[in-house]
Amino acid sequence: MEERIVSLLRPELITEAAHHWNATGKAVLLDDVSNFVYEFSSQDMRRILRLTHSSHHTEDEIIAELDWLIYLIQNGIPASQPILSQDGRYTERYPTGESYFVATAFEYAPGHFIDKTDPREWNSQFFRTFGRIMGRMHSLTKHYNADHLRQKRPHWYEDVILQRAEDYLPAEQRWVAAEVEKLLAQFGQKMPTVDSYGLVHGDVNPTNFHVRDGQLTLFDFDDCSYNWFINDIAVAMPLYSDMFAEEGWEARLTEFFQQYMRGYEEENHLDESWLEILPDSLRLQCLINLIACHASNVPNSRYRSFYELVLKIAQQGHPFFTYNFRGAYESAL
């Protein structure tokens, strides 16, 4: 998180926001990379409080996020339900000079982060369920209409991370911005259709869902934007997994991808030709993550080890960047 934003978040603002959702006790900080995320209790129930600075998302953008999230939940997507404040609103606004924070609250996702070392959790059945949920979201988003909102969610290429890449990167990493520009131009040549482009979560990975008894509950829709479906799939791939340092990683990756796509195809069809550019999409996601790390001051935070991993992959490459995803998919048919 940028230091100037941290300095704006007064302790009494956190207390006031939690009070709007009938908090009892102290709100405990869980995360402070893009938003300030807290856990609190209300009526003996675990809840999540999120405080977002207006420089990250406006209140209308957050309302658009919640509108889509509620639509997905109403149509069967397992996700953390937004909670109305005691004043009957999904968002509460707190001015801080010329800017403001927006508070939102959610039900706590049941379960825990998935244990990728436990074969009882990280297995073919889970991979298929994971893909099925993603396919269902892509199918549902084709029918979602946001025309009733004051402001829609942004398109992915409008993200400040991409618009100001060179401003965030240190001089020795400016090459990243040039490569991102080339990849953006490649996607810019594609013609968006309802079957390939729409409003997507944008950050479905093991840090943004909980599991319990094999069932997933998604959360953190903060990055949702209008984007290519293939980019949404790329984020779900285990790019930063430890498996690639072990023997037999290719067989495990193939199992993951084939089962994931089998589940995906149960709910939505994506033309196989998109799988040919999945390596480029994964490369792009890695570079975007690197820029985002600098934008959120991650190199100087407790998440520095993640930044170092992303930088290493950006500099040295990754097996994903040459993997034959289409071939793996077609061999599973």
Listing of model-derived features with the role each one plays in the protein:
Residues 288-333:
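ATP/Mg2+ or Mg2+-diphosphate-binding catalytic cores
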Residues 149-190:
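Active-site catalytic-loop/activation-segment of kinase and kinase-like phosphoryl-transfer enzymes
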Residues 33-44, 48, 82, 185-231, ...:
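Active-site acidic catalytic loop and adjacent metal/ATP-binding pocket
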Residues 42-144:
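ATP-binding pocket architecture of kinase catalytic cores
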Residues 54, 88, 105-119, 159-167, ...:
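A glycine-centered beta->alpha junction motif in the catalytic cores
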Residues 230-268, 284-300:
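Active-site activation/catalytic loop segments of kinase-like enzymes and analogous catalytic loops
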Residues 1-87, 213-215, 329-333:
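Conserved NTP-binding catalytic cores of kinases and kinase-like/nucleotidyltransferase enzymes
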Residues 125, 270-282:
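All-alpha amphipathic helical-bundle segments outside canonical DNA-binding/catalytic cores
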